């Protein structure tokens, strides 16, 4: 005997489905934004916004210097404005890091020296007072661009914007930060022979390589950013591989080892 079961109509089936789906736990709603508008964020985080503006100016002047046909700022003027904006950025950042506290004692000086912001403040001032060296603009420009991208994603997230550019910026900064730090470290190292060559060509100051050596020593000893030490270690390993190669002439191999020993003997201890 076949049992006849009445099929539910469409209304009943949809209501049943809605009831079953309603009984399942729904995902929690996203948290409300911390700030209702960008202006509110700016009012609450004025220093961060000033730093962002200074970094944008650094990138702007760098583009005018590297791409002269933009024509908004003369190239020679743009070069020095790169380092002026960079010096302002790192001075403000250093002020934030030391929380506005200032003292003329050894403890404060030691605390100041280990700050990366102090290193790049010195870097910016040194090249602000020297003849133009195009490669010198690269580190501060890359740093400014990276921090500007990070700030843009932060302010858009915290003000409730859901633009598709936010995850792209976050992904870009996450994937490219290490590459950018490596480029910065290598450019800072390769500036040393370039500055020495400028002396022999009559375009550089005798004091510039010595001042720059102090900066590079500070970067090598940095605790927060080991990219300079890593770059030196990678270069040392590559040169040692070349020197140990059977195809490398003995005088060249000896010269490489002497250069490695000379540079290693002058490496400062890590702070």
UniProtKB/Swiss-Prot annotation:
Membrane topology: Multi-pass membrane protein
Localisation: Membrane
Family matches, as InterPro entries: PER33/POM33_regulator (IPR051645), TMEM33/Pom33 (IPR005344)
Keyword Repressor: no
UniProtKB keywords: Membrane, Transmembrane, Transmembrane helix
Single GO biological process annotation from the record: endoplasmic reticulum tubular network organization
Region spans: Disordered: 1-32
Amino acid composition bias (Low complexity), ranges on this chain: 13-25
Pfam families recorded: TMEM33_Pom33 (PF03661)
Gene Ontology, cellular component aspect: endoplasmic reticulum; membrane
Predominant place of localization: membrane
TM annotation in the entry: 56-76, 125-145, 180-200
Family per similarity comment: Belongs to the PER33/POM33 family.
Protein's name according to its UniProt entry: Transmembrane protein 33 homolog
